[in-house]
Regions:
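C-terminal amphipathic alpha-helical interaction region
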Residues: 458, 473-592
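Acidic, low-complexity proline/glycine-rich segments
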Residues: 1-24, 274-287, 318, 324-325, ...
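Glycine-rich cofactor-pocket loops
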Residues: 27-30, 60-73, 286-303, 317-355, ...
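Amphipathic, small/basic residue-rich leader segments at the start of a protein or domain
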Residues: 1-122, 146, 576, 582-592
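Alpha-helix capping/hinge segments and adjacent helical runs
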Residues: 2-3, 180, 257, 368, ...
Length: 592
């Protein structure tokens, strides 16, 4: 059974991601380490004692569409009510609407634990938090006053409606339409697919944020508007009014996250009588909806990265517990009679340490991204720097962490051997749940394109160059520490950072020479190269914080393992970035 790693999470936040320094400088208001510890402890308790025990039944039963209504798995409605009672939905929401306005770092740490308990359940608050952010930033005063308080409390949930059958990654071709009405409202018509928690029985109302096109809108992405469309209309006194003209047509039958209802939503079908068209209100300006939605999408990408971290952590815990109990054969050098626990066999130990290193590296990257988001709002004159740092880290956090979630979950099955292939052990669920994360909220391939074409050029390339300089400083700090436990860590970090620096310089020059196809041929290898170097660097940073807690020896040992094993990939990845385009172009004849 999963147990929230509260101490490890707190350590990473404070001593690796930057929260401790931000608190000491007063950049996080009245927030102190004692309050941080208390919030993390209670979030961990909720994940361990309330969410995790219901994950299996959620996977087994799944969400069900019965007589036009979506029913959640047994126990999940009560679980959601407990969630509301705990006030968790409003951790980072504005205080004016009942939120706590706490740092984003705390929220993503809590999200990690809840996703480890059940990724399918945690998707509901994740989407609602994103909707709150979008309405807070772009909604009119009337929309905020009508909807935000109930969304912040969790009484009403939120969704994000982008995808259509023919419009996935390319939203410029979406066909959902909106028509103006004289009272300032709009009527929406169309179909949206893959809508997470689009319909369910846990909340009184569901607030859909829907992308649609006005009749006179420009073509492409410049003609997309964003609308708030509630399941139930809201009366002037705040009470619920009639059912809006929208419904869930069907639920998808998915590989994983079975407890999360993934809906096909129909708008404007006239199913409930009256005038056709789902009533909605404009969020932001007409034809500028994609910019409004991107705020929600960017933070959702980090939240999805946390899903990868969460699955990796839970899968690692399960595999390690099994490896300590399962006995097979005799490990080399084993003393005494009888079989050895498989954790003592070198190859099993290698797999488990790889799982641990990838998990902790992905956690540190994601928390560092959240720290940059917080500093972009709180750091005064340096806010622009932190805004760019958050932009640079977001695609890496999303892609590296979700790839790690899949890789670690797969290794977890391998550690279990044949039992891992049996559903009853629970190891397979982690892989089934993890597999969606590299796909949604922008595929990891799209994240790589974003990283290379939009994020490397920030400040003329100075942002990424400055970041690499910071990583070099970590390697120097390891070298000067003279701690034997680090082994060859400094040397391997130097080599990995040099590979990253060379690949970065080549990509920036290749883009400047207008050779976009060549640059994008190596975008995904570059993204992994960056993630691995960050993993080694952040694990080293944790190892250097030797006085922070009593686990310094363990942290240094894991750092050394990562540096001397995982970072061995960086040279090959650099070569794929710099030299892979020609062979890719030549081999495309095989795809014709």
């Amino acid at each position: 059974m999963y147990k929230a790693p509260v101490e490890e999470i707190a350590f990473t936040l404070k001593h690796v991601a930057g929260m401790g320094e931000a608190i000491s400088k007063g950049l996080l208001g009245d927030l102190g380490e004692d309050l941080v510890d208390a919030i993390l402890a209670e979030a961990g308790r909720f994940a361990t004692e309330e969410v995790a025990p219901l994950a299996e039944i959620g996977d087994r039963q799944g969400a069900r569409l019965i007589d036009g209504e979506v029913r959640l798995p047994d126990g999940w409605r009560d679980l959601y009510r407990h969630w509301i009672a705990g006030g968790w939905n409003g951790l980072t929401a504005p205080e004016a609407f009942g939120g706590q306005a706490l740092p984003h770092m705390l929220n993503v740490a809590a999200l990690e634990m809840w996703n480890s308990g059940s990724m399918a359940f945690a998707l509901a608050p994740t989407l609602t938090m994103g909707a709150i952010e979008a309405v807070s930033a772009h909604g009119s005063a009337a929309l905020k006053d009508t909807y935000l308080e109930k969304m912040v409390s969790g009484e009403w949930t939120g969704t994000m409606n982008l995808t259509e059958p023919h419009a996935g990654s390319d939203l410029g071709v979406l066909k959902a339409r909106a028509e103006r009405r004289d009272d300032g409202s709009y009527r929406l018509f169309g179909q949206k697919i893959f809508i997470t928690w689009g319909e369910h029985d846990a909340a009184d109302n569901i607030i859909h944020l829907v992308l649609a096109r006005l009749p006179d809108a420009p073509a492409g992405t410049r003609g997309i508007s964003l609308f708030l469309v509630p399941k139930f209309l809201v009366n002037d006194d705040g009470s619920l009014g009639p059912r809006n003209d929208l419904f869930c047509h069907s639920l998808e039958h998915k590989l994983g996250i079975h407890g999360s209802p993934t809906c096909t939503m129909i708008y404007g079908d006239g199913k409930f009588g009256g005038e056709k068209g789902a009533v909605g209100w404009l969020v932001g300006e007409e034809n500028k909806g994609l910019a409004c939605m991107f705020m929600m999408m960017n933070n959702a990408r980090l939240a999805v990265g946390m899903q990868g971290v969460a699955i990796a952590e839970a899968a690692t815990q399960k595999a390690l517990a099994y490896a300590r109990e399962r006995t097979q054969g005799r490990a080399p050098g084993a003393s005494g009679a009888g079989m050895s626990p498989i954790v003592e066999h070198p190859d099993v130990a290698r797999m488990l340490l790889t799982m641990k290193a990838l998990t902790q590296g992905a956690r540190a990257i994601s928390y560092a991204c959240a720290h940059a988001i917080d500093m972009s709002h709180r750091a005064g004159e340096t806010s622009r720097h932190w805004q760019e740092r958050a932009a640079l880290l977001t695609p890496i956090a999303k892609s590296f962490s979700t790839d790690a979630g899949v890789d670690v979950a797969s290794l977890g099955i391998q550690v279990h051997g044949g039992m891992g292939f049996i559903e009853e052990t629970g190891a397979a669920r982690y892989l089934r749940d993890a597999r969606i994360a590299p796909i949604y909220e922008g595929t990891n391939g799209i994240q790589a394109i974003d990283l290379v074409t939009r994020k490397l050029p920030l400040s003329g390339g100075d942002q990424v160059k400055g970041f690499i300089a910071e990583l070099k400083q970590i390697a120097d700090d390891v070298r000067r520490s003279n701690l034997d436990g680090f082994g060859e860590t400094a040397v391997r970090l130097d080599a990995g950072i040099a590979d990253l620096e060379q690949a970065t310089a080549w990509l920036i020059k290749t883009l400047a020479d207008d050779k976009t196809a060549e640059a994008l041929s190596g975008a995904t290898p570059y993204q992994r190269l960056f993630g691995l170097v960050l993993t080694g660097s952040y694990l080293a940073k944790g190892g250097l914080a030797e006085s922070a807690d009593g686990a310094a020896e363990n942290r240094i040992a894991l750092c050394r393992f990562a540096a001397e094993n995982l970072l061995a990939e960086t040279a090959a990845l650099r070569d794929r970035v710099v030299n892979g385009a020609a062979s890719l172009a030549a081999a495309r004849i095989l795809l014709a």
